[in-house]
Every structure is written in structure tokens, then in C-alpha cells.
Amino acid sequence: MGENGAKRWNFGANEVVERSNSLTIRDYLNTLINCLDGGDVRPVIPLGHGDPSPFPSFRTDQAAVEAICDAVRSTKFNNYSSSSGVPVARKAVAEYLSSDLSYQISPNDVHITAGCVQAIEILISALAIPGANILLPRPTYPMYDSRAAFCQLEVRYFDLLPENGWDVDLDGVEALADDKTVAILVINPCNPCGNVFSRQHLQKIAETACKLGILVIADEVYDHFAFGDKPFVSMAEFAELVPVIVLGAISKRWFVPGWRLGWMVTLDPHGIMKDSGFVQTLINVVNMSTDPATFIQGAMPDIIGNTKEEFFSSKLEMVKKCAEICYEELMKIPCITCPCKPEGSMFTMVKLNFSLLEDISDDLDFCSKLAKEESMIILPGQAVGLKNWLRITFAVELELLIEGFSRLKNFTERHSKNQP
């Protein structure tokens, strides 16, 4: 019996789940949404999460929509798929990724997942052996942190250096690693920093990972979202140096995150992952996981094959324009420093100068009051591992973006120590 004679039940909250959820972007966004003033009739400016698909300017290509409809009408994809995906989808992804490489990827190395997030879940679960640790960047995409916490895989953080264009602190990586380190994560183009790694820097990362005897996880969900001086280069180019697992999806480039179609590709030309047994472990975890909708998989050849380059180039030009406006407007706000002009993905990281602000205690307080006073959502940096910074999403309608920076400027002026 429980207190006061009440019946005691043998289930309840799971502390591991609670801790893991507290690391997610969604948890922070929900907190900020609850801060919004319901009496404010202005539209909410959503610069906190990376999903521009609701905006008319970022609708997907009609060819992709028709591919889905054709796959459904065909009735060929009403059945379950194999655990690693429908063969035509695996082949389509292999050919799509190979078009950027100096070699061909085998469809057998492609595993189709329910978005990139499921690929993360599968991979972290496979890596989480007792005593192991993984190297994650700081700042980071926190789904890796959350899943690692859930799987009780130790995380060690290496720094991305804003003064060096957010390049990896490779000396720090070597200092963190030991004989229990299993992998290093590289997100390129980078969420949350908005940088694109050069070919030379990627090679140095691969060489460092080889020296340490660890595999490279290459999160390339923003592949081809590069609009600065550096072209996108896949870490797959360095698979001869070190085992690489590439994660990706159609979510970002096609602006369809709700379709939940991603992939995980094992690049292991020397058989290192296979001989160690890790590939089989990965397949075993895949076998315990659910599959993406089969008709989405069946549509993949036509989604990839029928989407014209004009669609990609026009959308990328739009994102680039948004990035330029974002950077220009940030430079006008004294209490905010943007160390690097964004050149990839749809985000940038900026630092708050609290010496110029009053009544603001930290980045979460800043974002909470911004939501309440200006109906504007920006993600606090602590959500991505960098306290007292902000992650700003700029891929929205231009009118919303301009209005958002007007509100942000008004907010910072109102909370400035030097206000009249």
C-alpha cells in the first residue's frame, strides 16, 4: 500500500527518458511557445526551427508530389518493405550520392530510414556498448546528445571554433579520445553554425579519426545547402582513409521533412566495419526498427530523377538571399555578434553581449522574453550546447524575416542599458 492507504502502482516516470527529452530542441521550443502572449494579434515569427516547408516560397517541386501520387496509384508499394528498404529506393539513393563522388556506392550499403532522425537512433543504439564514448561537436544538433543519453553512451564534446570559421578543434579531439572512443560526428553543412567545411579540413578530420581508430559519422542532411565560397564536399570522399557512415534525407533539399525518408550509408572499402562485426550489429538494430512508408520509398527513383536542377538552384538562391539579409540585419544590433557570415544550411549562431543589456539573465531568459513581448521564437544557444548564444533560422518568407529583425531590434533597444 502507498501513503494514506492508497494502492501503490509499480510503474511511473522514467528518469532516463526525462533527462533525454530535456536535451531536445522540441522541449525548448515548447517552453518558448508557452511564453507567447495570447493577446498579441501579430503573427508569430518562427526563427527557432529548421522547417521552411509551410511557407509558399519553400514548397516542394511538383515532380516530387507526382512521384508520390504515382507510387500510390501503382499499388506496387502496399506491402511491407525489407528492413533495409525497397530495392529501388536503395538503388536511387546510391546513384544520387554517387553523383558527387569519384566512385560508385553499392545499393547494398544503403539502409533506408524514417527520416534522418531514425538513422541517428539506429546508429547511436549500435554504438552504445558498455563503457564506450562518442565525440560530438559543441555547438551541436542535440538529437545525438538526447539519443546518447537515452542509450547511456558517454558523450565528450570537442569545440567548433568561431574564430576559425567554426572549424573543428582537432587538437581538442585528440585530447578527448581514448581507447573507448568509437566515433566522431561531423555535421556538414553545419547545423547549427551555418558553416561549410573545406575539402582540406575534412581530410584533416578523416586523418585524425584514422589515427584514433574511430569511425566518422557524416551528417549530411543539408548536402548541397552551400551558397558561399566553399562547395559542399561529402565525407564519403575520404572513406579510403577511415570508415565513414553517411546520414541524409530528402527532408531539407526537397523541403519535405514530414515525408520521413532518410538513409544511412556504410562506406567501408577496406572491410574494417564488416570485419569488426559492426555492420552486422547495425543491421540487427535495423531489423528491430520500423520502416518508412513503402510508397514513399517506391517514389524515390522519380523524386530524385524527375526533380529539375532549376528547382534546387532557385531554392538555394532564395536561402542565400535570406542568409544575406539575416547577416546584414544582425550587424545592426549592438548586443549581438555574428562571428561568421552563414554559408550553408539554414542557420547561424550569434553571441549575446550581456554588458549591453539589462533585465536579461541568460540566453533562455532572452528568448523567453522575446517570445512574450514580440511573438518571435529564436532558439537559445544552450539548446545546442552553447550557453548565451542564439541559433537563428533564416529560411522563412522574406517579409517575415525582415519583420522578425525589426521586432528583434525593438526588443534589444527596449532592454538596452543605454536606452533613453
UniProtKB/Swiss-Prot annotation:
Gene3D superfamilies for the chain: Aspartate Aminotransferase, domain 1, Type I PLP-dependent aspartate aminotransferase-like (Major domain)
InterPro entries: Aminotransferase_I/II_large, PyrdxlP-dep_Trfase, PyrdxlP-dep_Trfase_major, PyrdxlP-dep_Trfase_small, TyrNic_aminoTrfase
SUPFAM superfamilies: PLP-dependent transferases (SSF53383)
GO molecular function, one term: L-tyrosine-2-oxoglutarate transaminase activity
Keywords tagged on the record: Aminotransferase, Pyridoxal phosphate, Transferase
GO biological process, one term: L-phenylalanine catabolic process
UniProt-listed Pfam families: Aminotran_1_2
Enzyme Commission number: 2.6.1.5
PANTHER family: TYROSINE AMINOTRANSFERASE (PTHR45744:SF11)
Annotated function: Transaminase involved in tyrosine breakdown. Converts tyrosine to 3-(4-hydroxyphenyl)pyruvate. Can catalyze the reverse reaction, using L-glutamate in vitro. Can convert phenylalanine to phenylpyruvate and catalyze the reverse reaction in vitro.
Protein name: Tyrosine aminotransferase
Lineage: Eukaryota, Viridiplantae, Streptophyta, Embryophyta, Tracheophyta
Chain's gene name: TAT
